[in-house]
Amino acid sequence: MTFGPRVHKSPFFDSTRRYGAKAFTVYNHVYMPTCYSSPLDEYWSLVNDVTLWDVTCERQIEITGPDAFRFIQMLTPRDMSKCQVGQCQYMVLTNQDGGIVNDAVLLRVGEDQYWLSPGDGDVLMWASGVAVNSGMDVEVFEPDVSPLQLQGPKAPYVARDLFGDWAVEMKYYWLKETTLDGIPLVVSRTGWSGELGYEIYLRDHRFGDQLWERVMQAGKPYNIAPAAPNTIRSIEGGMLSYVSDITLQD
Protein backbone atom coordinates (compact mmCIF):
# COMPACT_ATOMS: atom_id res chain seq x y z
CA MET A 1 0.00 0.00 0.00
CA THR A 2 1.18 3.52 -0.79
CA PHE A 3 0.67 5.97 2.07
CA GLY A 4 -0.57 9.43 1.15
CA PRO A 5 -2.05 12.60 2.67
CA ARG A 6 -5.63 11.89 1.58
CA VAL A 7 -5.93 9.16 4.23
CA HIS A 8 -5.33 9.86 7.93
CA LYS A 9 -2.52 8.29 9.92
CA SER A 10 -3.37 7.50 13.52
CA PRO A 11 -1.33 8.82 16.47
CA PHE A 12 -0.11 5.22 16.85
CA PHE A 13 0.86 4.77 13.19
CA ASP A 14 4.62 5.05 13.71
CA SER A 15 4.43 2.70 16.69
CA THR A 16 2.54 0.07 14.71
CA ARG A 17 5.19 0.20 11.99
CA ARG A 18 7.97 -0.19 14.56
CA TYR A 19 6.18 -3.19 16.03
CA GLY A 20 5.95 -4.94 12.69
CA ALA A 21 2.66 -4.02 11.02
CA LYS A 22 3.05 -5.30 7.48
CA ALA A 23 -0.39 -4.72 5.98
CA PHE A 24 -2.99 -1.98 6.25
CA THR A 25 -6.46 -1.24 5.00
CA VAL A 26 -8.41 2.03 4.88
CA TYR A 27 -11.30 2.19 7.36
CA ASN A 28 -13.19 5.43 8.01
CA HIS A 29 -10.54 7.24 5.95
CA VAL A 30 -7.81 6.07 8.38
CA TYR A 31 -5.01 3.54 7.85
CA MET A 32 -5.77 0.49 10.01
CA PRO A 33 -3.21 -2.31 10.53
CA THR A 34 -4.54 -5.68 9.36
CA CYS A 35 -1.57 -7.95 10.02
CA TYR A 36 1.60 -8.11 12.12
CA SER A 37 2.52 -11.81 12.17
CA SER A 38 -0.36 -13.87 10.76
CA PRO A 39 -4.11 -13.98 11.44
CA LEU A 40 -3.68 -17.39 13.08
CA ASP A 41 -0.81 -16.35 15.35
CA GLU A 42 -2.70 -13.22 16.35
CA TYR A 43 -5.79 -15.33 17.04
CA TRP A 44 -3.89 -17.51 19.51
CA SER A 45 -2.37 -14.45 21.18
CA LEU A 46 -5.88 -13.04 21.53
CA VAL A 47 -7.49 -16.14 23.03
CA ASN A 48 -4.55 -17.20 25.22
CA ASP A 49 -2.80 -14.00 26.28
CA VAL A 50 -3.41 -10.32 25.46
CA THR A 51 -3.22 -8.15 22.34
CA LEU A 52 -3.07 -4.43 21.58
CA TRP A 53 -4.93 -3.00 18.57
CA ASP A 54 -4.77 0.41 16.95
CA VAL A 55 -8.42 1.22 16.26
CA THR A 56 -8.19 4.96 15.75
CA CYS A 57 -10.31 4.18 12.68
CA GLU A 58 -13.24 4.13 15.14
CA ARG A 59 -13.39 7.88 14.61
CA GLN A 60 -15.31 9.30 17.52
CA ILE A 61 -18.28 11.60 17.06
CA GLU A 62 -19.01 13.89 19.99
CA ILE A 63 -22.54 15.11 20.58
CA THR A 64 -22.97 17.80 23.22
CA GLY A 65 -25.51 20.41 24.25
CA PRO A 66 -28.78 20.76 26.16
CA ASP A 67 -30.62 18.54 23.65
CA ALA A 68 -27.87 15.93 23.29
CA PHE A 69 -29.93 13.08 24.75
CA ARG A 70 -32.99 13.88 22.62
CA PHE A 71 -30.80 13.99 19.53
CA ILE A 72 -29.15 10.65 20.37
CA GLN A 73 -32.57 9.09 20.85
CA MET A 74 -33.70 10.38 17.45
CA LEU A 75 -30.85 8.51 15.76
CA THR A 76 -31.70 5.04 17.10
CA PRO A 77 -34.76 2.86 17.80
CA ARG A 78 -33.16 1.61 21.03
CA ASP A 79 -34.47 3.14 24.26
CA MET A 80 -31.45 5.06 25.59
CA SER A 81 -33.19 6.51 28.66
CA LYS A 82 -31.44 4.12 31.06
CA CYS A 83 -27.93 4.97 29.84
CA GLN A 84 -26.24 6.62 32.82
CA VAL A 85 -23.22 8.91 32.90
CA GLY A 86 -20.22 6.57 32.80
CA GLN A 87 -22.09 3.86 30.90
CA CYS A 88 -21.83 2.54 27.33
CA GLN A 89 -24.54 1.04 25.15
CA TYR A 90 -24.54 -0.71 21.80
CA MET A 91 -26.89 0.88 19.29
CA VAL A 92 -27.88 0.83 15.64
CA LEU A 93 -28.31 4.11 13.80
CA THR A 94 -31.26 4.15 11.41
CA ASN A 95 -32.51 6.44 8.68
CA GLN A 96 -36.05 7.70 8.10
CA ASP A 97 -37.06 4.35 6.58
CA GLY A 98 -35.51 2.20 9.30
CA GLY A 99 -32.49 1.21 7.24
CA ILE A 100 -29.33 0.68 9.28
CA VAL A 101 -26.92 3.55 8.61
CA ASN A 102 -24.28 2.15 10.97
CA ASP A 103 -23.85 0.44 14.32
CA ALA A 104 -21.94 2.05 17.16
CA VAL A 105 -21.04 1.95 20.81
CA LEU A 106 -22.37 4.98 22.66
CA LEU A 107 -20.28 6.32 25.54
CA ARG A 108 -21.99 8.73 27.92
CA VAL A 109 -18.96 10.70 29.08
CA GLY A 110 -20.91 13.50 30.81
CA GLU A 111 -24.45 14.61 31.54
CA ASP A 112 -24.81 16.22 28.10
CA GLN A 113 -21.68 14.76 26.47
CA TYR A 114 -21.82 11.62 24.34
CA TRP A 115 -19.36 9.86 22.06
CA LEU A 116 -20.40 7.61 19.20
CA SER A 117 -17.82 4.98 18.31
CA PRO A 118 -18.98 3.83 14.85
CA GLY A 119 -18.14 1.23 12.26
CA ASP A 120 -16.96 2.08 8.77
CA GLY A 121 -18.94 4.89 7.13
CA ASP A 122 -19.38 8.64 7.10
CA VAL A 123 -21.48 8.82 10.26
CA LEU A 124 -20.16 12.26 11.21
CA MET A 125 -21.42 13.73 7.95
CA TRP A 126 -24.79 12.00 8.31
CA ALA A 127 -25.30 13.02 11.96
CA SER A 128 -24.25 16.59 11.20
CA GLY A 129 -26.84 16.75 8.43
CA VAL A 130 -29.56 15.38 10.69
CA ALA A 131 -28.65 17.95 13.36
CA VAL A 132 -29.03 20.91 10.98
CA ASN A 133 -32.76 20.37 10.54
CA SER A 134 -33.49 18.82 13.94
CA GLY A 135 -34.38 22.06 15.70
CA MET A 136 -32.28 20.86 18.62
CA ASP A 137 -29.53 22.67 20.52
CA VAL A 138 -26.61 20.30 19.89
CA GLU A 139 -23.06 20.35 18.58
CA VAL A 140 -21.80 17.44 16.48
CA PHE A 141 -18.07 17.21 15.80
CA GLU A 142 -15.02 14.94 15.81
CA PRO A 143 -13.02 15.32 19.05
CA ASP A 144 -9.29 14.69 19.48
CA VAL A 145 -9.85 11.10 20.59
CA SER A 146 -8.00 7.99 19.37
CA PRO A 147 -8.86 4.52 20.72
CA LEU A 148 -6.72 1.47 21.36
CA GLN A 149 -8.16 -1.93 22.19
CA LEU A 150 -6.53 -4.12 24.85
CA GLN A 151 -8.08 -7.55 24.34
CA GLY A 152 -7.59 -11.08 25.64
CA PRO A 153 -7.93 -13.08 28.88
CA LYS A 154 -4.87 -11.39 30.40
CA ALA A 155 -6.08 -7.88 29.57
CA PRO A 156 -7.36 -7.30 33.14
CA TYR A 157 -3.86 -7.93 34.52
CA VAL A 158 -2.34 -5.37 32.19
CA ALA A 159 -5.12 -2.89 32.97
CA ARG A 160 -4.61 -3.42 36.70
CA ASP A 161 -0.88 -2.76 36.39
CA LEU A 162 -1.56 0.38 34.38
CA PHE A 163 -4.52 1.87 36.23
CA GLY A 164 -5.08 0.03 39.50
CA ASP A 165 -7.66 -2.36 40.91
CA TRP A 166 -10.62 -0.31 39.68
CA ALA A 167 -9.87 -1.47 36.13
CA VAL A 168 -10.37 -5.12 37.10
CA GLU A 169 -13.55 -4.26 39.01
CA MET A 170 -15.04 -2.20 36.18
CA LYS A 171 -18.39 -3.52 34.96
CA TYR A 172 -18.94 -4.59 31.36
CA TYR A 173 -19.92 -1.61 29.18
CA TRP A 174 -18.94 1.04 31.71
CA LEU A 175 -16.23 3.70 31.43
CA LYS A 176 -14.01 5.89 33.56
CA GLU A 177 -12.10 9.10 32.86
CA THR A 178 -8.51 8.87 34.07
CA THR A 179 -4.89 9.78 33.34
CA LEU A 180 -1.76 7.69 32.88
CA ASP A 181 1.57 9.44 33.33
CA GLY A 182 -0.29 12.70 32.75
CA ILE A 183 -1.93 11.43 29.53
CA PRO A 184 -5.70 12.14 29.48
CA LEU A 185 -7.75 9.01 28.80
CA VAL A 186 -11.14 7.38 28.92
CA VAL A 187 -11.06 3.63 29.66
CA SER A 188 -14.07 1.43 28.92
CA ARG A 189 -14.82 -2.27 29.40
CA THR A 190 -15.71 -2.80 25.77
CA GLY A 191 -14.20 -4.37 22.69
CA TRP A 192 -14.74 -6.29 19.48
CA SER A 193 -13.06 -9.59 20.26
CA GLY A 194 -15.42 -11.86 22.17
CA GLU A 195 -12.74 -11.93 24.89
CA LEU A 196 -12.18 -9.91 28.04
CA GLY A 197 -11.01 -6.48 27.06
CA TYR A 198 -10.85 -2.73 27.30
CA GLU A 199 -10.77 0.26 25.02
CA ILE A 200 -8.34 3.02 25.94
CA TYR A 201 -9.37 6.34 24.40
CA LEU A 202 -6.45 8.75 24.04
CA ARG A 203 -7.67 12.35 24.41
CA ASP A 204 -4.58 14.09 23.01
CA HIS A 205 -3.00 12.78 19.80
CA ARG A 206 0.43 14.12 20.77
CA PHE A 207 0.85 11.25 23.25
CA GLY A 208 0.26 8.42 20.77
CA ASP A 209 3.74 6.89 20.76
CA GLN A 210 4.11 7.35 24.52
CA LEU A 211 0.82 5.61 25.31
CA TRP A 212 1.44 2.72 22.91
CA GLU A 213 4.87 2.06 24.40
CA ARG A 214 3.58 2.33 27.96
CA VAL A 215 0.90 -0.31 27.34
CA MET A 216 3.28 -2.64 25.51
CA GLN A 217 5.83 -2.46 28.32
CA ALA A 218 3.14 -3.15 30.92
CA GLY A 219 2.02 -6.14 28.89
CA LYS A 220 5.42 -7.81 28.56
CA PRO A 221 4.98 -10.07 31.63
CA TYR A 222 1.72 -11.30 30.07
CA ASN A 223 3.12 -12.04 26.60
CA ILE A 224 1.36 -9.11 24.93
CA ALA A 225 1.43 -8.92 21.14
CA PRO A 226 0.35 -6.20 18.71
CA ALA A 227 -2.54 -7.41 16.61
CA ALA A 228 -5.32 -6.42 14.25
CA PRO A 229 -9.06 -6.91 14.75
CA ASN A 230 -9.43 -10.67 14.33
CA THR A 231 -12.08 -11.85 11.87
CA ILE A 232 -11.87 -15.47 13.05
CA ARG A 233 -12.69 -14.54 16.63
CA SER A 234 -15.42 -12.08 15.62
CA ILE A 235 -17.20 -14.83 13.68
CA GLU A 236 -16.88 -17.20 16.64
CA GLY A 237 -18.22 -14.49 18.93
CA GLY A 238 -21.19 -13.73 16.65
CA MET A 239 -20.19 -10.09 16.23
CA LEU A 240 -21.38 -8.25 13.15
CA SER A 241 -19.37 -5.82 11.07
CA TYR A 242 -21.05 -2.96 9.22
CA VAL A 243 -20.89 -3.33 5.42
CA SER A 244 -19.73 -6.97 5.68
CA ASP A 245 -22.70 -8.20 7.73
CA ILE A 246 -25.05 -5.20 7.97
CA THR A 247 -26.09 -2.80 5.22
CA LEU A 248 -28.52 0.07 4.72
CA GLN A 249 -30.99 -2.43 3.26
CA ASP A 250 -31.19 -4.41 6.53
Where on the chain are the PLM-derived regions?
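Acidic, proline/glycine-enriched N-terminal capping motif
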Residues: 1-91, 99
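Conserved, structured C-terminal
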Residues: 1-34, 107-250
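Short amphipathic beta-strand starts and helix->beta connectors
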Residues: 39-48, 93-103, 132-135, 179-187
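Acidic active-site catalytic centers that drive phospho-/nucleotidyl reactions
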Residues: 54, 103, 199
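Short, acidic/polar N-cap/turn motifs at the starts of alpha helices
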Residues: 58-60, 90, 103, 145, ...
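Short secondary-structure transition/capping motifs
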Residues: 60-64, 95, 105, 112-119
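Internal amphipathic helical hairpin motif
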Residues: 66-100, 154-183
